[in-house]
Amino acid sequence: MAPADTKKAESGPPKLSDHKEILDESTFEQILEMDDDEEDRDFSKSIVYGFFDQAENTFKKIQKEIDDKNLAELSALGHFLKGSSATLGLVKVKEGCEKIQNFGAHKDETGLIDEPDTETCLKAIKNTLDEVKVEYRKVEKLLRRYYGEEVKDEEEKPEEKEVKEEEKEEKPKEEPKKEATESKETKEPKETSK
């Protein structure tokens, strides 16, 4: 089964339709339609890679504004990155940026209910920023692969590691069960090989 997976990866770019949870294919295809050459895709690639730079810079600005407790600027930055990510069809990134925009406007994540406490809004923005970065890394890897760049799955940014560590902390009871299952599986092949 593994060799088939390897062949898929080598046969060309990933199928965008397999990643609907993070990328709106029809929106992204509108960007692709602007390419003069479907094989090179230089124009769309420049737009996408420009977004990568823009997102990285905006993440840094958001972190600075969190530290400065500047909700108005955080709302503006969330709005800015929401628009850029929506243009490319980056579903989860857009949704997260909209939440940052709402929290920065002293609202809840939906933007419908007022949230007067600045510290609550700042904490929500920080948590949402961490989530957005994780979703951004997923779609960044997908698009870099789409444009023919080799991307290692092991490459993780610090925020991805933090989210995975938080998930591990939430599920500590499952680990002993897995170990017990692994020990049992290890013993079973020995018994069947006799």
State the predicted function of each range.
Residues 1-76, 86-194:
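Two-component system phosphorelay core
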